[in-house]
Amino acid sequence: AISFVHFAPNYPNIEALAKLVSSDSLAEPSQLLIRLHPSHFQDKPKIFAEERARVFDLEKKYPHVHVVQPVALGGSLGYYGGEDMDEKSSMMAYSDVVVTVYSTMLVETAVHDTPMIAATIDTPGGWNKPKKFSLSLKEIGDWPTHKRFRDAKAGRVAENENELRDALNMYLKDKTVDAKERRKFIENEITVTDASSGKRTAEYILSVLKKANRKDR
């Protein structure tokens, strides 16, 4: 599925977070670690490069804001290769709260039992560019994965800065809020949750090889 960074600017969500962590609005002293979408590192279309530049300006403006800068893999491979998965996973595991737009990363975050917020702060008119399709972030909440996330009450949805502040403070004060719902969400999304998929995959491949060897005899 196409990423929502293509549908609408993500900057309002990021700016709201940067302002909150740099003010006295949050229950705990906080810092913001920003992970941009791979499309943000494209120079065409210009909208992604322009939004990337605005985000890096936030990093310069606010002392407690940091942007993850992946190393390009070279050629057409772009950014965020397989070796980046450990970093992404650790961000979800060790963050106090993960904030994203509606995203399948909510499923991955729930695996780590980390509180999560879907931020849908819109820019009026979207991209406001001729012939560039825009879709309000608030309109994608009924898409399959996102609707299941909302129905499970596995996290909170923030449609404006005040809702974002309140949800952040709730989780910063008590990380166990919605823990039961997060677990139920994962049980509904993922068939087996014993962290042994690698072992089972290897056992299956080995069983296929053994059957093939028996047929060859």
Where on the chain are the PLM-derived regions?
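A nucleotide-sugar donor-handling region in carbohydrate enzymes
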Residues: 1-13, 42, 165-169, 173, ...
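C-terminal alpha-helical cap of glycosyltransferases
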Residues: 194-217
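Beta-sheet entry/capping signal
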Residues: 31-33, 96-98, 115-117
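Catalytic binding pocket for nucleotide-activated donors in carbohydrate/polymer assembly enzymes
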Residues: 104-190
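A structural alpha-helix within SAM-dependent methyltransferase catalytic domains
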Residues: 18-22, 172, 202, 206
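Conserved catalytic-core segment of nucleotide-activated headgroup transferases in glycan assembly
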Residues: 1-76, 158
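Alpha-helical elements of Rossmann-like donor-binding domains used by nucleotide-donor carbohydrate transfer enzymes
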Residues: 16, 163-166, 200, 204
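Donor nucleotide-activated moiety binding/catalytic core segment of transferases
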Residues: 46-107, 111-112
